[in-house]
From Swiss-Prot:
Database matches in InterPro entries: Ribosomal_uS14 (IPR001209), Ribosomal_uS14_bac/plastid (IPR023036), Ribosomal_uS14_CS (IPR018271)
Keywords per UniProt: Chloroplast, Plastid, Ribonucleoprotein, Ribosomal protein, RNA-binding, rRNA-binding
Entry keyword annotation includes Ribonucleoprotein: yes
Transmembrane segments: none
Family statement: Belongs to the universal ribosomal protein uS14 family.
Organism phylogeny: Eukaryota, Viridiplantae, Streptophyta, Embryophyta, Tracheophyta
Molecular function via GO: rRNA binding; structural constituent of ribosome
Chief location bin: plastid
Localization terms from the record: Plastid, Chloroplast
Organism: Lemna minor
Protein name (record): Small ribosomal subunit protein uS14c
Entry GO CC: chloroplast; small ribosomal subunit
Subunit text: Part of the 30S ribosomal subunit.
Domain of life: Eukaryota
Length: 100
């Protein structure tokens, strides 16, 4: 289980990213449309004045139950060992173990 502080930090980053998503997207769109270099620098300064944790690259996918940062399956939002336990105990409907 990950430390609770790390899980809370990740939740805080998700909230910030959602809050500034539209602003960040509009500023990036303006940069691509304006031909003047001096205006691009001004808009770039506005973009850099946004909080660092509001950037989508700062987010890290974590396991929904344990908060584990590695070995996650996107479809389920779970880490590998938790996914395996849940499939073995039939807690995930429709998931079957492969056999050949």
């Amino acid at each position: 289980m990950a430390r609770k502080s790390l899980i809370q930090r990740e939740k805080k980053r998700q909230k910030l990213e959602q809050k500034f998503h539209l602003i960040r997207r509009s500023l990036k769109k303006e940069i691509s449309q304006i031909p003047s270099l001096s205006e691009k620098w001004e808009i770039h300064g506005k973009l850099q004045s946004l909080p660092r944790n509001s950037a989508p690259t700062r987010l890290h996918r974590r396991c929904f139950l344990t908060g584990r940062p590695r070995g996650n399956y996107r479809d389920f939002g779970l880490s590998g060992h938790i996914l395996r336990e849940m499939v073995n105990t039939c807690l995930l409907p429709g998931a079957t173990r492969s056999s050949w």
